[in-house]
């Protein structure tokens, strides 16, 4: 369940279990005590009326009942002096002496621990769910580990409303794309901010060459975390919830709370998750027709080859082991964990390995007035040959387009020893043919790309409770990593990528991030009013450095060392670096009245180093909100457990990219010289400004049903783009600002949870609808040299797709994902395709709208059934709307290896109007034309399936709990018209390359098992 199980739901579950057990015991007791005559009855109540399902027992006996729907109970067989014990989850247990009275009403007081659900919100502070004026969704850590993924964010797909998550197509450990409430910025970041235990984390990515030709997609910072260390995750989808975190939170926040030690006991947990991956969604290809002599394309006669590209792929394995220790006393609690993640990919000689070591200690001293909380993590990661898509460093072009008449076993022997050269050379008699074709086995074994990363994190917080209503806290976090990226391209690799003796690239990058803040908190109550307020300041400092070398090998083939690089021709030293710092002050306040009205407000002022040379050195933003608990304002019926309405308004600023307000001098590795920037600095740039409001309703009914719905709308102003400058200015362009991008939508979650005896059932459905629209794009821009307006286009071209004639083009009235094509088959005045037997088909040059890569609706449905330790869980997910495009399908048609092209040949050709044209002639014309390779992205699938059994603890003398289970992921694609998995992302770092397939690695179906032991 996304929402924390409510107190009322827990009470209902306990009531049903108690009713079944206690009434059986009461019946048995009655047979044994027929001679007893003492009888008492009454009603159990709380401040709101009768309490249903409370356990009423005679202390020290099995004589007991549960209260009925009116809170009534009746006990017999009592003796004077017996003690009646009344208990139910959420209330303080009450004991009352029996003195012979026939009537005894008992009033219960709610337990302070269960007065209200609490969720973790901004700054890591737990707040009453009733008080929140914005939407927050919380998931427990157990929901992330049921079906483990090397990147735990992929486990959230379909389980959180308002969040779109795309898995990277490069397999386990790859970065994920997380977008909340739509894409807001033309040039800025759209990714959510990650916050660990209240402290922001810099979510760096170690990918390179991020484009539709990407060769090494890499991972990101959040993928390094061990999901077993996570206690809970809160998703703050709106700016009102995230306003205190600064400009990085403009696109929402993922709040991660990690585990602590446990007071009073020692718990050791050991877990293993092993899964196996097979290629799932893959293009349909043919092996019936072969290639004519001297041709690569398979447009020849029937050969009925047994070639099957699927045989190239391995069965991938993903093994995750974890051991943790939680222990503690009242004064000191400790948590330690070790985790290993070892993955072999579906591509030969590819994999991902990660090793996590974590510890956390919480100590109280000075009469429990001071709390010191310290944590540390060390992570080692090694990934090899991660491949996403594109023509470069990708085995799939050669694999898919391989001529069907030829012998694949010759290709499997990918290198042959050349006695004249003295080393082995590649065997691939076809060349790259302009589409990056290489021997797939050579790519995986002799074009080796590897990342090795070491990362350590340290955090500490010191809290001093000055009084019972005032405390101060200071926090610091250090997050550093070193990453080494190497490319080893062996001699005879295609000359596009390597020199005659091979090529070598060796780059080391370092990132050092330090965050610190100080916060004072007031929590005071005056009669019916209460105040919770925070005021503080923070500093966030990030330094990045990269140094490396890239070039062809000179003297010794296949000797990969810096001193063997060709220093005269193709030697390219590489060095980059930047230093960002932000400073801020912030405040928040929550005023409550009688636990039914909550007024909240926040304010933050930022000073950003990126703005240092502009005329606007800082920027401020705020939020206000109101929450009204209607069910607490009147005597609500018993079936209505909670009814809350809420609303909020927020503004959040977001800084633009560095180096836009100052001339800088980049180094040109080709000419070994410095050059001035081609971009004129604009000192009048302002931060992006997102203004958002939302209204929502939260309700809980009949102790089992919860319903949450939110409507939101946001507008993001000060969009940054580039305006062209005349050549006489000495610059090419300058940054300018304008625009207004609107997102509006609905987030909805509906859940039900109940139990009957040994059987339990829970279900949760989430739905997100988002509309993205560019309300305003470009204003006039003034030439800073002449003072005259610069003529601007009424559109911005943001992304082109290699292999297809399509671009993402932004226009007023359109969306941030609109795709346009440029060629269609010529048609006559009657709408028929024009075909001249002598000239063939022809194309018409015209810009036309293909659709948007942004989905309209995301949904998910998760259900759990439990019985006597057996748990069955299923998750269905779906997306409606949007388009995807496939350059892969275009290439398959061009080379005659698609099943579609074989079917056309079987049918005698392609039917055009009333005639038939040869299939090869038809596909030759439409190859590369996006209009014919665009597909609906709508899809529905059985995303996850879990079946587990918790063995009875008595089997282990009550000293151990053991759970074993079966897990599956991507088990059934219920509906999908696209020829590849439309939810995979070949490039998670850009909005403008979503929904595009260029020899993308296929998605996988994963099946495995898990074991968990707890001592």
What do these predicted regions represent?
Residues 269-302, 388, 548-550, 736, ...:
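Conserved small-residue
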């Amino acid at each position: 369940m996304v929402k924390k199980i409510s107190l009322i739901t827990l009470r209902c579950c306990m009531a049903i279990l108690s009713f079944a057990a206690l009434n059986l015991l009461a019946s048995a007791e009655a047979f044994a005590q027929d001679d007893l005559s003492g009888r008492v009855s009454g009603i159990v109540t709380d401040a709101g009326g009768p309490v249903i399902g409370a356990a009423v027992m005679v202390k020290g006996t099995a004589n007991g009942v549960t209260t009925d729907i009116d809170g009534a109970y009746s006990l017999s067989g009592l003796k004077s002096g017996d003690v009646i014990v009344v208990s139910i989850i959420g209330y303080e247990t009450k004991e009352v002496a029996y003195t012979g009275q026939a009537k005894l009403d008992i009033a219960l007081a709610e337990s302070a621990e269960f007065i209200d659900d609490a969720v973790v919100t901004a700054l890591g502070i737990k707040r009453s769910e009733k008080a929140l004026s914005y939407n927050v969704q919380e998931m427990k850590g157990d929901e992330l580990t049921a079906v483990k993924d090397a990147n735990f964010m992929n486990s959230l797909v379909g389980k959180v409303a308002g969040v779109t998550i795309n898995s990277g197509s490069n397999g386990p450990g790859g970065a994920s794309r997380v977008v909340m409430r739509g894409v807001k910025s033309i040039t800025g970041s759209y990714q959510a901010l990650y916050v660990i235990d209240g402290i922001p984390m810099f979510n760096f990515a170690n990918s390179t060459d991020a484009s539709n030709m990407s060769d090494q997609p890499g991972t990101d910072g959040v993928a390094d975390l061990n999901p077993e260390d996570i206690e809970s995750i809160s998703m703050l989808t709106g700016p009102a919830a995230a306003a205190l975190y600064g400009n990085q939170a403009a696109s929402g926040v993922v709040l991660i709370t990690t585990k602590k030690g446990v007071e009073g006991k020692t718990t050791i947990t050991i877990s293993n998750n092993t899964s196996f991956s097979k290629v799932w969604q893959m293009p349909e290809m043919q092996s019936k027709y072969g290639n004519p002599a001297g041709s690569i394309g398979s447009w020849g006669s029937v050969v009925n080859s047994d070639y099957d590209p699927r045989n190239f792929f391995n069965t991938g394995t993903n093994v995750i082991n974890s051991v943790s220790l939680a222990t503690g006393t009242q004064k000191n609690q400790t948590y330690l964990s070790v985790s290993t993640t070892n993955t072999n990919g579906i591509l030969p000689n590819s994999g991902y390995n990660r090793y996590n070591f974590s510890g956390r200690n919480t100590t109280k001293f000075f009469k429990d007035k001071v709390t010191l909380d310290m944590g540390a993590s060390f992570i080692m990661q090694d990934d090899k040959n991660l491949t996403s898509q594109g023509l470069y460093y990708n085995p799939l072009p050669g694999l898919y387009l391989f001529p069907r008449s030829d012998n694949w076993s010759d290709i499997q022997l990918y290198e042959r020893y050349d006695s004249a050269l003295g080393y082995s050379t590649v065997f691939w008699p076809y060349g790259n043919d302009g589409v990056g074709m290489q021997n797939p086995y050579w790519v995986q074994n002799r074009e080796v790309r590897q990342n090795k990363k070491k990362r350590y994190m340290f955090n500490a917080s010191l809290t001093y409770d000055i009084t019972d209503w005032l405390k101060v806290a200071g926090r610091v976090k250090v997050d550093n990593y070193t990453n080494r990226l190497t490319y080893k391209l062996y001699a005879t690799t295609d000359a596009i990528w390597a020199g005659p003796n091979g090529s070598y690239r060796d780059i080391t990058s370092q990132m050092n991030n330090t965050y610190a803040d100080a916060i004072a908190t007031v929590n005071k109550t005056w009669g019916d009013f209460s105040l919770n307020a925070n005021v503080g300041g923070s500093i966030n400092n990030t330094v990045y450095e990269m140094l490396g070398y890239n070039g062809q090998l000179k003297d010794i083939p296949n000797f990969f060392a810096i001193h063997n690089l060709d220093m005269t021709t193709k030697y390219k030293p590489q060095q980059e670096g930047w230093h960002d710092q932000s400073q801020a002050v912030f405040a928040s306040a929550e005023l409550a009245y009688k636990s039914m009205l909550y007024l909240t407000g926040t304010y933050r002022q930022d000073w950003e180093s990126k703005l240092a040379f502009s005329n606007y050195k800082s920027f401020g933003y705020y939020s206000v909100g109101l929450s009204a608990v209607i069910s607490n304002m009147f005597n609500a019926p018993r079936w209505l457990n909670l009814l809350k309405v809420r609303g909020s308004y927020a503004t959040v600023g977001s800084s633009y990219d560095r180096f836009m307000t100052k001339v800088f001098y980049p180094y040109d590795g080709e000419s070994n010289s410095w050059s001035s920037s081609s971009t004129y600095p604009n000192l009048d740039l302002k931060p992006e400004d997102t203004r958002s409001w939302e209204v929502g309703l939260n309700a809980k009914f009949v102790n089992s049903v919860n319903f949450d719905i939110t409507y939101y709308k946001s507008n993001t102003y000060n969009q940054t783009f580039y305006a062209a400058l005349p050549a006489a200015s000495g610059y090419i362009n300058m940054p300018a600002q304008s625009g207004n991008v609107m997102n509006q939508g609905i987030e909805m979650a509906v859940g039900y949870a109940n139990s009957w005896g040994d059987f339990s059932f829970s279900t949760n459905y989430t739905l997100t609808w988002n509309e993205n629209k560019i309300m305003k794009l470009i204003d006039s821009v003034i030439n800073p040299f002449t003072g005259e307006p610069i003529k601007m286009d009424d559109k911005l071209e943001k992304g082109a797709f290699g292999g297809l004639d399509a671009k993402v083009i932004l226009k007023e009235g359109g969306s941030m994902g609109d795709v346009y094509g440029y060629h269609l088959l010529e048609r006559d005045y009657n709408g028929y395709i024009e075909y001249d037997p002598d000239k063939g088909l022809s194309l018409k040059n015209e810009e036309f709208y293909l659709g948007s890569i942004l989905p309209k609706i995301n949904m998910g449905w998760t259900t759990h059934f439990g019985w006597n330790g057996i748990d069955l869980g299923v998750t269905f997910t779906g997306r409606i709307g949007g388009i995807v495009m496939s350059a892969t399908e275009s290439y398959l048609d061009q080379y005659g290896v698609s099943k579609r092209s074989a079917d056309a040949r079987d049918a005698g050709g392609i039917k055009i109007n009333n005639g038939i044209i040869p299939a090869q002639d038809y596909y030759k014309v439409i190859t590369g034309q996006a209009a014919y390779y665009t597909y609906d992205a709508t899809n529905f699938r059985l995303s996850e399936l879990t079946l587990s059994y918790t063995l009875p603890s008595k089997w282990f003398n009550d000293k151990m709990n053991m759970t074993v289970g079966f897990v599956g992921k991507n088990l059934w694609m219920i509906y999908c018209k696209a020829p590849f998995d439309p939810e995979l992302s070949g490039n998670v770092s850009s909005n403008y390359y979503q929904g595009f397939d260029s020899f993308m690695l296929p998605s996988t179906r994963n099946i495995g098992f898990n074991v968990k032991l707890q001592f």
